[in-house]
Amino acid sequence: MARDIAAPPVPTNHQELISWVNEIAELTQPDAVVWCDGSEAEYERLCGELVEKGTFRKLDPIKRPNSYYAASDPTDVARVEDRTFICSAKEEDAGPTNHWKDPAEMRAIFTGDKGEGGLFRGSMRGRTMYVVPFCMGPLGSPLSALGVEITDSAYVAASMRTMTRMGQPVLDELGDEGFFVKAVHSVGAPLEPGQADVPWPCNSTKYISHFPEDREIWSYGSGYGGNALLGKKCYALRIASVMARDEGWLAEHMLVLKLTPPTGAPKYVAAAFPSACGKTNLAMLEPTISGWTVETIGDDIAWMRFGEDGRLYAINPEAGFFGVAPGTGEHTNANAMKTLWGNSVFTNVALTDDGDVWWEGMTEETPAHLTDWKGNDWTPESGTPAAHPNARFTTPAAQCPIIAPEWEDPRGVPISAILFGGRRATAVPLVTESFDWNHGVFLGANVASEKTAAAEGKVGELRRDPFAMLPFCGYNMGDYMGHWVDVAKDKDQSKLPKIYYVNWFRKDDAGRFVWPGFGENGRVLKWIVERLEGRADGVETPIGVLPTKESLDTDGLDLADADLEFLLSVDKEVWREEAALVPEHLNTFGDHTPAELWDQYRALVRRLG
């Protein structure tokens, strides 16, 4: 007999959704099913339950109102790229940079065979199953899309209220027959009757699996952020990139900012950098140059479609920031610090003795005593970080003091420039303008950076990260590069965004960062805007157009002339070596690499002589 646990009254007449919820309930066998309505009362109830369970600890209500601290299991602290699968019908559609598994084989691992076996069978026993309807993007926007996540984690249900538009309004928008992405999540820790729970349930077996043709996500064994908040990377990038390929738009790992000069109209800029290259810092920039202001649209993901006027329009599909805490402080990102005043959840940071949070880089002075993320006493002599390097904050975007008024405009904002960049100590100048769209795609295809703590791997290795999408592209990366070429083919080239490559991380022979970065990066944005308006000079080099020394505003900047020359130099010898690395990279994708990128490579070699 099927357990019709989601029987009426349910808050929707969407029969496909109701029967799917029943099907998952029958498979996972939860003790109860709760349809989330997204209300403030529900959020408070979930947080209260998490406090009772020991998952959450309420922070000092004066210092950090309505905010909580959570510590994960020490084995469940980051995205697990080696357990992340793209289960496309054909292996070549996943491509060489994704892990592929046959979809039928993967489904058998999850649901077993003929009603027996499978990781999800009975995985929610002893737990509550939450049905979490959510919208990526402003409700009602033609650029937005809907999803429903089924999860046995109250931490996930609560976090989804911050990170997405969630609850009853989404079910209302969905109607009786609307399309939604199906997302199933279990921490994989069923409870037997009388068995005590742990504060952070998870399983040593982990799968984060995507079924692109079915627009489905199944995640097992992890309660951590990107593995469990399935609206984020799983939907907004991996599944959405496939939707975008099929429908002629772009789903990208990009911040979006609004830049307003002292006179003239604002410009909207999108930028793609790999993890830990300063996306959030740039999205919330406080320019040091007088009269220029930056406002935030989004800090991590952009969905972009061409409008009827031929311009590319972007929305931020998220409603919150899920940021890396360490390194975020008054000096590096004052606006992020102001955003975190309250209504936030902090995971794997350190706790102060007076009931607040702390992490490396938050303050100039390190506290004399803390409780570290593993719950141990900590002092500056401990010799280990107090916060995990990938510790996170989850906070509402609406609290950002410089959130742009149009951040939720259903039409999106028109993008004038797209920036790519990585963390490169060598070769790559401060800023390079592409010659045209396809050359810009070539620059994006060659993004490279050092590995960071946001994924499990060694720190400091150089890794190619095309478009900063390597861990997030839901299909063959060669086809993805081809899609970037294709979307612009029939467009008015004069209306396409200009593409730039930036590098804040150039080092001299002594290992010193030559460019001061942070707020000074506004000077580079100023040059870009003036280029867009035809008011700034540039010099053609073999790799693209660079600022002349005079056209980059360095007034009031303590930067030696030799350093400026170094930042704006192209060493042909070094660049011949750099160019020699490109064929191996493009060959990775075989005949999926678009011919246009090989044309760009050959043109680069010719220009380098």
Curated annotation (Swiss-Prot):
Keywords: Cytoplasm, Decarboxylase, Gluconeogenesis, GTP-binding, Lyase, Manganese, Metal-binding, Nucleotide-binding. Mn(2+) binds at residues 233, 253, 300. InterPro entries: PEP_carboxykin_GTP_CS, PEP_carboxykinase_C, PEP_carboxykinase_GTP, PEP_carboxykinase_GTP_C, PEP_carboxykinase_GTP_N, PEP_carboxykinase_N. Substrate binds at residues 79, 224-226, 275, 390-392. GO terms for biological process: cellular response to glucose stimulus; gluconeogenesis; glycerol biosynthetic process from pyruvate; oxaloacetate metabolic process; propionate catabolic process; response to lipid; response to starvation. GO terms for cellular component: cytosol. Pfam families: PEPCK_GTP, PEPCK_N. Binds 1 Mn(2+) ion per subunit. Coiled coil: none annotated. Pathway: Carbohydrate biosynthesis; gluconeogenesis. It is found in: Cytoplasm. Its cofactor is Mn(2+). Its EC number is 4.1.1.32. PROSITE patterns: PEPCK_GTP (PS00505). It is an enzyme of class 4 (lyase). One of its GO terms (molecular function) is GTP binding. The active site is at 277. It catalyses: oxaloacetate + GTP = phosphoenolpyruvate + GDP + CO2. GTP binds at residues 276-281, 392, 423, 518-521. Catalyzes the conversion of oxaloacetate (OAA) to phosphoenolpyruvate (PEP), the rate-limiting step in the metabolic pathway that produces glucose from lactate and other precursors derived from the citric acid cycle. HAMAP family: PEPCK_GTP. Belongs to the phosphoenolpyruvate carboxykinase [GTP] family. Monomer. This is Phosphoenolpyruvate carboxykinase [GTP]. It comes from Streptomyces coelicolor (strain ATCC BAA-471 / A3(2) / M145).
